[in-house]
Amino acid sequence: MFQDVLVITVAAGRGGDGAVSFRREKFVPKGGPDGGDGGRGGSVYLRARGSVDSLSRLSKRTYKAEDGEHGRGSQQHGRGGEDLVIEVPRGTRVFDADTGELLADLTEEGQTVLVARGGAGGRGNMHFVSPTRQAPRFAEAGEEGEKRRLRLELMLIADVGLVGYPNAGKSSLLAAMTRAHPKIAPYPFTTLSPNLGVVEVSEEERFTLADIPGIIEGASEGKGLGLEFLRHIARTRVLLYVLDAADEPLKTLETLRKEVGAYDPALLRRPSLVALNKVDLLEEEAVKALADALAREGLAVLPVSALTGAGLPALKEALHALVRSTPPPEMPKPVPRKEVQAGVEVVPVAEGVYEVRAPEVERYLARIKGDLMEAAGYLQEVFRRQGVEAALRAKGVRAGDLVRIGGLEFEYIPEV
């Protein structure tokens, strides 16, 4: 079953914990710390593949990459978690399901985007040795991997989009001009999902057609099937309005343009042609009168018959010329990935009480594993290196004042 909208959850792997371990071997009475590092958690990527034609292949609703292994003694590092690559159709747009931000537009074969970054592995206790800290009994825990909900929207990539009423002969026209085999039947709403076909102009030149389910009056208010599929013509360079010559084509064109404009006014400015289909059902004079009346609407009109093939060579040439002279439409650009902002902010919350907001420092605090008291010296080094000490002094924090940061609370003792 064709599916062009899907919400999934992606979760990257957690980083492995660093080990608290000491060398214990015969004849080595004072072995030092030898805790290995944890492995990095696997990340989650989306990759565009032309061989994938629908989001329905994504059978799961949650996708999780592998966690990193924990470090071990004897300086043994944990193995990194395996990355997870999810293949999606070309033309898939990726949104953050909670914020609505566009994260990626995967239009090229093999184009890959990182959607959930794996957590960093924690460092083992052998990294925290210093002249005053010979046997650290603490290490770093691994970071949690990113987790987010994604909304995937497939927008077909084609040069020409076919727009018309149900049973106007769009699928027949697609089949007559290309090697596509859409379902064709003498009743409305035969086409329930978009179809693609390639029109071969010569051995070197070709262009693609996209046929979407028929649009009816009131589609912009939720009637019928066509409106929800109009996104599939948003990328097309040219629109081809397919009209049934025997069924009020002037009124039909007016309705189609009204509904298309209600979906996206920019589509009305897209270069367009009119294919007056099923002319084999009318007399030549009637066809000419209809074509002249439609031409007064400001669009080039080509009488055709998908059944007999009449007018199709001229339609191919006209579409090809328009495609060649029209650049691809501008699409919304993805939002650049936001990195954690560095910096330190000291905020007074009460008399003699201050809160420190420093994302990078809070990351260090959250990852301490083991003896916190023994880690105090290391944390003081982190505070100095990250500018917390300087920020507290600049804010006028005095000895004995209460400082809160990352869930910890302590009395401030200025460095001498």
UniProtKB/Swiss-Prot annotation:
Annotated ranges, domain OCT: 336-414
Biased composition (Gly residues): 32-42
Biological process, per Gene Ontology: ribosome biogenesis
Keywords per UniProt: Cytoplasm, GTP-binding, Hydrolase, Magnesium, Metal-binding, Nucleotide-binding
SUPFAM superfamilies, alphabetized: Obg GTP-binding protein C-terminal domain (SSF102741), Obg GTP-binding protein N-terminal domain (SSF82051), P-loop containing nucleoside triphosphate hydrolases (SSF52540)
GO cellular component: a single term: cytoplasm
Ranges of compositional bias, category Basic and acidic residues: 63-72
Essential cofactor(s): Mg(2+)
Pfam family for this entry, one: MMR_HSR1
UniProt binding sites for GTP: 164-171, 189-193, 211-214, 277-280, 305-307
E.C. numbers: 3.6.5.-
Positions of region (Disordered): 25-44, 62-82
Boundaries of every Obg domain copy: 1-157
Occurrences of domain OBG-type G (ranges): 158-324
Stretches of the chain forming a coiled coil according to its record: none
Gene3D superfamilies: GTP-binding protein OBG, C-terminal domain, GTP1/OBG domain, P-loop containing nucleotide triphosphate hydrolases
Record GO terms (molecular function): GTP binding; GTPase activity; magnesium ion binding
Subcellular location per the Swiss-Prot or TrEMBL entry: Cytoplasm
Annotated binding of Mg(2+), by residue: 171, 191
InterPro entries documented for this protein: G_OBG, GTP-bd, GTP-bd_Obg/CgtA, GTP-bd_prot_GTP1/OBG_C_sf, GTP1-OBG_CS, GTP1_OBG_dom, GTP1_OBG_dom_sf, OBG_GTPase
Assembly mode: Monomer.
HAMAP family associated with the record: GTPase_Obg
Family: Belongs to the TRAFAC class OBG-HflX-like GTPase superfamily. OBG GTPase family.
Function as written in the Swiss-Prot or TrEMBL entry: An essential GTPase which binds GTP, GDP and possibly (p)ppGpp with moderate affinity, with high nucleotide exchange rates and a fairly low GTP hydrolysis rate. Plays a role in control of the cell cycle, stress response, ribosome biogenesis and in those bacteria that undergo differentiation, in morphogenesis control.
Protein name: GTPase Obg
Organism field: Thermus thermophilus (strain ATCC 27634 / DSM 579 / HB8)
